[in-house]
UniProtKB/Swiss-Prot annotation:
This protein's name: Chaperone protein TorD
Main location: cytoplasm
GO CC annotation: cytoplasm
Role, per record: Involved in the biogenesis of TorA. Acts on TorA before the insertion of the molybdenum cofactor and, as a result, probably favors a conformation of the apoenzyme that is competent for acquiring the cofactor.
Alphabetical GO biological process terms: protein complex oligomerization; protein folding
UniProt KW Chaperone keyword: yes
Family according to the record: Belongs to the TorD/DmsD family. TorD subfamily.
Subcellular location: Cytoplasm
Record bears the keyword NAD: no
InterPro entries attached to this UniProt entry: Chaperone_TorD (IPR023069), DMSO/NO3_reduct_chaperone (IPR020945), HscB_C_sf (IPR036386), TorD-like_sf (IPR036411), TorD/DmsD_chaperones (IPR050289)
Pfam families for this protein: Nitrate_red_del
Native source organism of the sequence: Vibrio atlanticus (strain LGP32)
Protein keywords: Chaperone, Cytoplasm
Gene: torD
Length: 215
């Protein structure tokens, strides 16, 4: 169980990291950190998994190209804005409602469903995320918190139950729309940094459901 809990911490950290990338633009300091040995080693480690390798290779390629991109931080912030802060027609809005809602508007049923899930588990997400509950950053932050909470148990049976809850969340709240979101990111993000992040998110969600199912 000790190894499982340690792995849970790693899983949560990955979801929190992905959440942070979709939550706001990277600052210059944060961008500089992505060129550090620490982060590059972390990415290399993830890339050792065959499922994640294509997305990691794309992300590393984008990071390498950022080092020679003029006004890299400003340009990457503009990419973030074009993708996630504009209109559905011209961007890849990071809300479940825009992909699986009925109205084509924000705060549709997926947002209400997510609010109910958060209330049911009595879990608070990052208070800096002042967005509808079905924003991808909120859903990923919540998932990380859900994983960490499961580490509080000392019973194998309870841990298995928590795995089933996590698997259901990924399959019903993420994999129902993240594939469509990923396609839009690739259609719009010509530079490719955020497109590679969305690919990594999708690949990791699929990989994680296999792990949770015991495959």
């Amino acid at each position: 169980m000790k190894d499982t809990k340690a792995f849970n911490e790693q899983r949560a950290e990955i979801y929190w990291w992905l959440s942070s990338l979709f939550a706001k633009e990277l600052t210059q300091e944060e961008l500089d950190h992505y060129h550090s040995v620490e982060i590059r080693s972390f990415l290399t480690g993830l890339g050792e998994n065959e499922t994640l390798k294509p997305a990691i290779d794309s992300l590393v390629d984008a990071l390498n190209r950022l080092q020679t991109r003029e006004d890299a931080q400003l340009e990457l912030s503009a990419d973030f804005c074009d993708l996630f802060l504009k209109t559905d027609k011209h961007g890849a809005l990071p809300y479940a409602s825009m992909y699986i809602g009925q109205t084509g508007l924000l705060n549709d049923k997926p947002a209400k469903d997510m609010e109910e899930i958060m209330a049911k588990h009595n879990l608070v997400v990052n208070q800096d995320l002042k967005e509808p509950a079905d924003h991808i950053a909120i859903e990923l932050d919540f998932l990380g918190n859900l994983i960490i909470r499961s580490n509080e148990t000392e019973l194998e049976e309870e841990l298995e139950k928590s795995f089933a809850v996590q698997q259901q969340f990924i399959e019903q709240q993420l994999l129902t729309w993240v594939p469509k979101f990923n396609v839009k990111c690739h259609d719009i993000d010509t530079f490719g940094f955020y497109a590679s992040v969305s690919s990594l998110l999708l690949a990791f969600c699929k990989l994680d459901t296999q792990y949770l199912a015991g495959e």
